[in-house]
From Swiss-Prot:
Subunit structure: Monomer.
Catalytic activities: DNA(n) + a 2'-deoxyribonucleoside 5'-triphosphate = DNA(n+1) + diphosphate
Keyword Transmembrane (UniProt): no
Protein name stated in the entry: DNA polymerase IV
GO CC list: cytosol
Length: 352
């Protein structure tokens, strides 16, 4: 078992918590972050809203039936990005091995840390305290020998808690771990596992590598390692991007049409980034990740720059239409990005 010390930090109901911080009169009420509209989906739900069954990626229409008294606030991605930058500034006091997964979560490798703190649990405790002191927001943390285990552990004491999974306890922990807790195991995969008599990671561990390959394709190889607590992926420090992008990991695997419901707010977020960086783009890329971790991308390149957010959204929707429908496919991530960047006003042609 690895001797690394990995922390997974996950902010608690991040978007909703930022909105509640800005509008404290809403505290205690079910708050939903979403644009209102017939085809809109929830970006985030406060813990009070979750008690009514509301969650991100749910349609606003469904949410209003389940919780008519919920308060809806539009997302403010520029603000979320500012707060995320504050949080990352806290991380950098301890390590430069930081791998952001989104605005509200990241992996940190603190095996060697700037403060020479021997216990990763103490590092996590200090980081969470600093985040709260400087932003007023709470975070949960998982501490483990690798990224897979740290991510699972961060969910164990939510909200505003942390859970340590030391190497000598990993196998016992995994023996009874429900399969639905394994990242990437969504409804489709879980149903197949259950049909094979699997209920826990311990059950899955009793299958040979070849059997898992037959049942789950190449994802079977990864499952074989994960249920044995093996994950050698390093924490990859963020590097300068050659494109600008935004994406969302869905709380459950969704069919393509439902996943595409996130495109309007992704496009709006991405357009804000483009505007703030004072650049223009000539290509748009759609990224999808399936339940079994296959990556699907589609790209459109134009002879001139995108003129506005509506054109960006239109391009993303055209790319969705290029994804061949597969009845078994369910998606756990959707994102869009732009490339072929040029400084604003350098490209004068009209978009066509």
């Amino acid at each position: 078992m690895s001797s690394r010390k990995i922390i997974h930090i996950d902010m608690d109901a991040f978007y909703a918590s930022v909105e509640l911080r800005e509008q404290p009169h809403l505290k205690g009420r079910p708050v939903v972050v979403a644009w209102e509209g017939a085809r809109s989906v929830i970006c985030a739900a406060s813990y009070e809203a979750r008690q009514f069954g509301l969650h991100s990626a749910m349609s606003v229409a469904t949410a209003k039936r389940l919780c008519p008294q919920a308060v809806y606030v539009p997302p403010h991605f520029d603000l979320y990005r500012q707060v995320s930058a504050q949080i990352h500034a806290v991380f950098r006091r301890y390590t430069d091995l930081i791998e952001p997964l989104s605005l509200d979560e990241a992996y940190l490798d603190v095996t060697r840390n700037f403060k020479n703190i021997p216990y990763a649990s103490e590092v996590a405790k200090e980081i969470r305290a600093a985040i709260f002191a400087e932003t007023g927001l709470t975070a949960s943390a998982g501490i483990a020998p690798n990224k897979f285990l740290a991510k699972i552990a961060s969910d164990w004491r939510k909200p505003n808690g942390q859970f340590v999974l030391p190497p000598h306890k990993v196998m016992a922990f995994l023996e009874t771990l429900p399969l639905g807790k394994i990242p990437g195991v969504g409804k489709v995969t879980l149903k197949k596992m259950q049909s094979l008599g699997m209920r826990t990671a311990g059950d899955l561990r009793r299958f040979e590598r070849g059997e898992l390959l037959n049942h789950f394709g190449r994802y079977g190889y990864r499952l074989y390692d994960l249920v044995r607590g093996t994950d050698e992926r390093p924490v990859k420090a963020e590097r300068e991007r050659l494109q600008i992008s935004t994406e969302i990991t869905l709380p459950e695997d969704l069919p393509l049409e439902q996943a595409a419901g996130h495109l309007p707010h992704l496009a709006e977020d991405l357009w804000r980034q483009i505007t703030r960086k004072n650049v223009e783009a000539q290509s748009v890329t759609l990224k999808l990740k399936t339940y079994d971790f296959r990556i699907i991308t589609r790209t459109l390149t134009y002879s001139s720059v995108l003129p506005d957010c509506a054109a960006l959204l239109q391009a993303a929707q055209m790319l969705i239409a290029r994804v061949p429908p597969q009845t078994e496919d369910a998606f756990r991530l959707i994102g869009i990005g732009v490339g072929h960047l040029v400084p604003k006003n350098q490209q004068q042609d009209l978009w066509a």
